[in-house]
Amino acid sequence: VGIKSCKIDCTVIKILYFVLKGKKQHMGKLIILRGNSGSGKTTVAKALQKKLGRNTMLISQDEVRRNMLWVDDGIDTKALPLMAELLRYGREHSEFSILEGIMYDEWYRSLFELANELYGSNVYAYYFDLSFEETVRRHNTRNREFGEKDMRRWWREKDFSSALREQAITCEMDTDSIVEKIYSDLNADRKATAFMSK
């Protein structure tokens, strides 16, 4: 009985090992796009989602907070728990997850820290470092739900987060070049990982 029990226990342990190992093997990549209102984050996020293809999840701060939940923004915004759960889902089930929004560092730092905890070195963060005048110019080329006065009120100069290793996106870069840069960054790391695993 002891030998049979040992064999069964060993088999169960082996099955659990491979199941857990399989779960750990899948770790999606997270792209974070931050910056002031009107800088073009959403446009880039949607274009990047199409470029990356199926199984790419797009988490838009405005969509979650304003449209889905209709809650106020702030340090303890009720959007944070749902955005955190979406990051967890993306890590386990999506090849790529894109998180985009203004997301002031002061208010969303806990979310960025969670992103690092979940995705580790698979976090690719970009900050749209544009002048106020440039964001207004870009905003005026689209359908406007708000104006320059609101944008001035929301404005935060160079709100880089020390919780993220953010690369700066400047006004010289258009949507296509930004998408290509991010795509190139993702592929460069993918090739390096494949080389190291040989």
Regions found by a protein language model. Name each.
Residues 39:
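ATP-binding Walker
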Residues 42:
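Walker A/P-loop
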Residues 141-198:
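Small-molecule kinase domains that catalyze NTP-dependent phosphoryl transfer to phosphate-bearing small molecules
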Residues 36:
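P-loop (Walker A) phosphate-binding loop of NTP-binding proteins
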